[in-house]
Amino acid sequence: MNEVSVIKEGWLHKRGEYIKTWRPRYFLLKSDGSFIGYKERPEAPDQTLPPLNNFSVAECQLMKTERPRPNTFVIRCLQWTTVIERTFHVDSPDEREEWIRAIQMVANSLKQRGPGEDAMDYKCGSPSDSSTSEMMEVAVSKARAKVTMNDFDYLKLLGKGTFGKVILVREKATGRYYAMKILRKEVIIAKDEVAHTVTESRVLQNTRHPFLTALKYAFQTHDRLCFVMEYANGGDLFFHLSRERVFTEDRARFYGAEIVSALEYLHSTDVVYRDIKLENLMLDKDGHIKITDFGLSKEGISDGATMKTFCGTPEYLAPEVLEDNDYGRAVDWWGLGVVMYEMMCGRLPFYNQDHERLFELILMEEIRFPRTLGPEAKSLLAGLLKKDPKQRLGGGPSDAKEVMEHRFFLSINWQDVVQKKLLPPFKPQVTSEVDTRYFDDEFTAQSITITPPDRYDSLGSLELDQRTHFPQFSYSASIRE
């Protein structure tokens, strides 16, 4: 096994991803492709102090620019399973050339080594060394039974956004109902969401938990990716909370316990969810939680340049994400804190329409509670919403166990939770599987158009390229049932 060595090190000015200020960081570029940044210069290259930034330069792209400052360079690389861009500047053109040459050399040497370990790495705290192209090759496929769009009846539109739409469908052969997420390849590729989309598919395939949405099929057409998923028709918690304004502590405890159970399972498989928000917390027909991610932005389709600015809804971003620090499982406990605060207090813990002010609040403002909130609930929320992920409830090595052992959950039998033995505090009043009363009628009242306008349907020269991004994108859960 090759010993990892430091190829280049030194100070760089790194531009914040969310708060656009320049921060000095001491970076080490290593022979294994890791590119790690510290607030202070490490006393020894092998010191165990956790870095603030941790990227991989494998398969990276580099670009020189003189904006917004002279001697700037941009690295496009992989962090976790998302393609990201990070901007740096140095004091002279020569220094910039040295960094670019060193990074390119490491990237090239990794390419020559060829594929090593499994192409998808979900380990917490470190970026995946796999390249985007390798991820595409792994894509998704266990079954060869050909599933097509003709196998379904299309009943109602459930949601719509930047990348596509979600439709309630009925499988013709079985009469079963599913939610079909239809994503446009053109948009996924244009917005660098290929890695994220393939990751989502693999996570859905490999997870089996009562409070996580199961994937039944995944297939593609020449211009679409289609996920056929378990359908939960009890509506999302955003829908219910916006009508009821606040939940009782008992109701919030029930939902919180089911979310904790699902996060414990995901973390045990080295998956960090990263996107806990009310819109992603669905209820099934009995009132149990189903965590989903339809991958649709709430704002709908927009051509604005801000689309790519946020990975996740800004109000839910954890302080360590805003500060461009490397993050781990604790981001999910922050997300849990935000949604449970909303449930019990009827508002977000931090809110401002001005994003810069919002970020200041998330980073600096102390959490405040309404007088009506009980002491156990206050203690839980204060613990989950600690700014420092190491001090946060759930941020320690025992992860979910810390949260489960908090006195707010004292009455909860966790075995009963996962076995769905607890009685849901609210049972959706649905009369049939096609009853969509808990979905926004802004969508459900619309007629369904599977074929979008010509400018999206006619892909021309992009078509072949898109097939190379998503080879073997097919999956059927039936072989595992």
Swiss-Prot record:
Entry's Gene Ontology molecular function annotations: ATP binding; metal ion binding; molecular function activator activity; protein kinase activity; protein kinase C binding; protein serine kinase activity; protein serine/threonine kinase activity
Residue list for modification Phosphoserine: 34, 126, 447, 461, 474, 478
SUPFAM superfamilies to which the protein is assigned, alphabetical: PH domain-like, Protein kinase-like (PK-like)
Disulfide bonds: 60-77
Post-translational modification: Phosphorylation on Thr-309 and Ser-474 is required for full activity. Phosphorylation of the activation loop at Thr-309 by PDPK1/PDK1 is a prerequisite for full activation. Phosphorylated and activated by PDPK1/PDK1 in the presence of phosphatidylinositol 3,4,5-trisphosphate. Phosphorylation by mTORC2 in response to growth factors plays a key role in AKT1 activation: mTORC2 phosphorylates different sites depending on the context, such as Ser-474 or Ser-478, thereby facilitating subsequent phosphorylation of the activation loop by PDPK1/PDK1. Ubiquitinated; undergoes both 'Lys-48'- and 'Lys-63'-linked polyubiquitination. TRAF6-induced 'Lys-63'-linked AKT2 ubiquitination. When fully phosphorylated and translocated into the nucleus, undergoes 'Lys-48'-polyubiquitination catalyzed by TTC3, leading to its degradation by the proteasome.
Annotated positions of the Phosphothreonine modification: 309, 451
Tissue specificity field: Expressed in adipocytes and hepatocytes (at protein level). Expressed at low levels in skeletal muscle (at protein level).
Cellular component annotations (GO), alphabetically ordered: cell cortex; cytoplasm; cytosol; early endosome; insulin-responsive compartment; nucleoplasm; nucleus; plasma membrane
Quaternary structure note: Interacts with BTBD10. Interacts with KCTD20. Interacts (via PH domain) with MTCP1, TCL1A and TCL1B; this interaction may facilitate AKT2 oligomerization and phosphorylation, hence increasing kinase activity. Interacts with PHB2; this interaction may be important for myogenic differentiation. Interacts (when phosphorylated) with CLIP3; this interaction promotes cell membrane localization. Interacts with WDFY2 (via WD repeats 1-3).
Protein name: RAC-beta serine/threonine-protein kinase
Origin species: Rattus norvegicus (Rat)
Phylogenetic lineage: Eukaryota, Metazoa, Chordata, Craniata, Vertebrata
Gene assigned in the entry: Akt2
